[in-house]
Amino acid sequence: MKIKHVWFDFSDTIAHTNEQAHDKLKYESYAKVLGRPVDDGLKREFEEAYEAHHHSISDIFFSLGRPAGWWAEQMATQDPAEMFALMEPDIPETLQSIRRLVPISMFSNIMLGKALPALGIEPGWFEHMLSSKMAGRPKPAPDGFYKIVELSELEPGEILYVGDVVAKDILPAKQVGLQTGIIYRKSDEADYSFDKFADILGLVSK
């Protein structure tokens, strides 16, 4: 089925985080919620939870009773120029090329209003900017993926969702019938595997 709309994940699809700054924020946030100091035991516990929650930090805090957008709000307090860097330098150019062919949108567990401009990406390029707070539950819950279909006003099979984590991105997207693409790795679970970001343009151009 022809692709008529492309939706993107953000973290480790469009941009990666500064590991040191990100680690500091996630451990301190976890310690704050639990009322415990940051120590090696807490860090190990967090990393175990990260695996159990399919690499979704938002879902960890959601499971601890925080609202769906709580982790996004913590991330939004940081300087995006220090927190994020593009996965590939030509991503803004490629996004512009894709949007000349089909609409593009973004679904992320974090708020992107400040992060995107810091990376040379204009929020106005995207038809929709969907957050986990808007969806109701963070990924990997399917809520946001059903919302993608609603917002796109298309059949699920006409929408391509691109992300980097099988359990958090690919499987819930497939659950609602979206076409799926995994980036920077390969997986038989996804309909497409992209070695580099520009490969997405090649697919949409067909």
Name what the model sees in each region.
Residues 1-8, 69, 92, 96, ...:
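Asp-based, Mg2+/Mn2+-dependent phosphohydrolase catalytic module
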